């Protein structure tokens, strides 16, 4: 088998003021052929599966560009088209191939292309023709469009959130594409909207049992079942949760199973409704809890969902209550980092931190802070892969330690603090800019956490979303 593989993706918050331009890709992942490290990453499961087949089954693998950016605002059209066309030119030079296996996200929006994945897949199909098996592995926080299904033979989405199964899903994709190319199967896909904007954490019920049920259904002729969670921070026509079923030759079966599962997901909607109190109330509850350390999740300022990661709202809560034993990170503020490097370790600086990017960032915070540590090219360790944070500074003021980063990312692992000499396990509160992915590393320190967040967006903030859509609309049923 001769296979071409490449990656192109990001997760777009259509209301974010942060353009996902060249710097965003360079800071996260912009690897040309031959530059991909020898570890799998969340965005390159198909490439990893291809490499294994090259070693074990003598496949011929052509690796294209791998480009992936931290979630942010829409991708400038010239950036998207340049990366897309670079991958297409690499594919053109690799022809003929038997398989094209892509690592995509599913929620990438450019300023003039709402469905980047569908657009890329259409260009790939136009290049390779109908006989080549074309497929993609995607993040479950995706917008599944009909164009994506029309242009691909197989689409496989992560089942787990936090995303721990990207290697397994990459292997699943390659297996199905190989079987397709050998004519052992003829995959057909059918999706059913669940008409929901919701979070589906797979570590807890009721979603844990749903994932197990989906896996149990994957017996021939059912080839693959995915819950596409959707990405609620995007206002696009295909937003919202969906069920995708891939079956061998039997589209009616795929339609029936996806419809049944979609109704089951819709029926659990009230169990998924957030019952978390407002931020101030949740923080008051955290103050009364005995666990030490206790993780406070700054969920509204999670860069992994497209937020800036520069809000100081939780720091203000800590200060208002006189908390003297807390650490927070990462707070994205390249200018403050630069000032810290200018001052050096031990310097006492008047810094204005955070609150720089847009309305959701809130106000900046003026502090008199000691620079306690500096590190060039800091990173977090995520499954053996480095998640870059760029140049970083650790500062301390009023008993609060803050990790300032020059590259925007969410919190994954205690190496965020340890790499700067901070022991977060000894603090009363560990404040993390994350939602779910922090479990990957911080559960080893403590399983106890409190989510701090503001009320969700109102219905008025969506103009392109299909309606009805729960919880924006309450009184309706799925057909």
Name these PLM-found stretches.
Residues 56-63, 89-100, 282-294:
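Glycine-rich phosphate/diphosphate-binding loops that line cofactor/substrate pockets in enzymes
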Residues 63, 85, 263-266, 378-479:
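Extended hydrophobic packing segments that form well-structured cores
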Residues 4, 8-11, 15-17, 77-84, ...:
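Active-site histidine-anchored catalytic micro-motif
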Residues 2-4, 60-62, 98-100, 132-136, ...:
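Structural motif
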Residues 181-210:
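Internal, active-site/partner-interface "lid" segment
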Residues 65-86:
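Charged, often glycine-rich, active-site loop that binds/positions anionic groups
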Residues 200-399, 403:
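Hard-cation-handling environments
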């Amino acid at each position: 088998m001769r296979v071409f593989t490449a990656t192109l993706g990001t997760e777009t918050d259509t209301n974010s003021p942060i353009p996902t331009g060249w710097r965003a890709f360079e800071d996260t992942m912009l690897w040309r052929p031959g530059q991909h490290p020898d570890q799998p990453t969340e965005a390159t499961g198909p490439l990893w599966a291809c490499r294994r087949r090259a070693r074990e089954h003598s496949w011929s693998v052509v690796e294209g560009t791998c480009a992936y950016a931290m979630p942010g605002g829409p991708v400038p059209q010239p950036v998207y088209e340049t990366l897309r066309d670079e991958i297409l030119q690499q594919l053109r030079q690799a022809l003929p191939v038997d398989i094209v296996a892509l690592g995509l996200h599913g929620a990438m929006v450019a300023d003039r292309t709402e469905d980047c994945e569908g657009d890329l897949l259409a260009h790939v199909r136009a290049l390779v023709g109908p006989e080549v098996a074309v497929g993609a592995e995607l993040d479950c926080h995706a917008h599944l469009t009909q164009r994506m299904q029309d242009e691909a033979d197989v689409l496989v989405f992560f089942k787990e959130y936090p995303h721990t199964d990207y290697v397994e899903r990459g292997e699943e994709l390659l297996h199905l594409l190989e079987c397709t190319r050998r004519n052992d199967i003829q995959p057909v896909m059918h999706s059913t909207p669940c008409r929901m904007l919701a979070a589906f954490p797979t570590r807890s019920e009721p979603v844990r049992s749903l994932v197990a049920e989906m896996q149990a259904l994957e017996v021939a002729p059912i080839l693959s079942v995915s819950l596409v969670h959707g990405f609620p921070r995007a206002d696009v026509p295909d937003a919202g949760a969906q069920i995708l079923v891939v079956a061998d030759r039997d589209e009616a079966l795929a339609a029936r199973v996806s419809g049944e599962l979609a109704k089951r997901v819709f029926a659990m909607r009230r169990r998924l409704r957030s019952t978390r109190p407002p931020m101030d109330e949740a923080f008051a509850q955290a103050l009364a809890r005995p666990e030490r350390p206790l993780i406070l999740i700054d969920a509204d300022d999670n860069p992994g969902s497209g937020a800036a990661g520069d809000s100081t709202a939780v720091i203000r809560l800590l200060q208002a209550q006189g908390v003297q034993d807390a650490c927070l990170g990462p707070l994205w503020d390249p200018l403050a980092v630069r000032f810290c490097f200018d001052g050096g370790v031990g310097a006492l600086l008047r810094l204005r931190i955070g609150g720089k990017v847009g309305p959701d960032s809130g106000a900046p915070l003026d502090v008199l802070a000691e620079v306690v540590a500096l590190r060039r090219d800091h990173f977090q360790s995520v499954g053996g892969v480095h998640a870059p944070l760029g140049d970083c500074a650790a500062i301390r003021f009023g008993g609060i330690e803050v990790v300032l980063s020059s590259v925007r990312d969410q919190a994954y692992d205690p190496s965020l603090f340890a790499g700067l000499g901070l022991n977060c396990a000894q603090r009363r509160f560990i404040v993390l800019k994350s939602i779910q992915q922090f479990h990957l590393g911080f559960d080893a320190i403590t399983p106890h956490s409190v989510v701090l967040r503001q009320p969700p967006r109102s219905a008025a903030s969506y103009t392109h979303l299909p309606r009805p859509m729960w919880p924006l609309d309450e009184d309706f049923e799925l057909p």
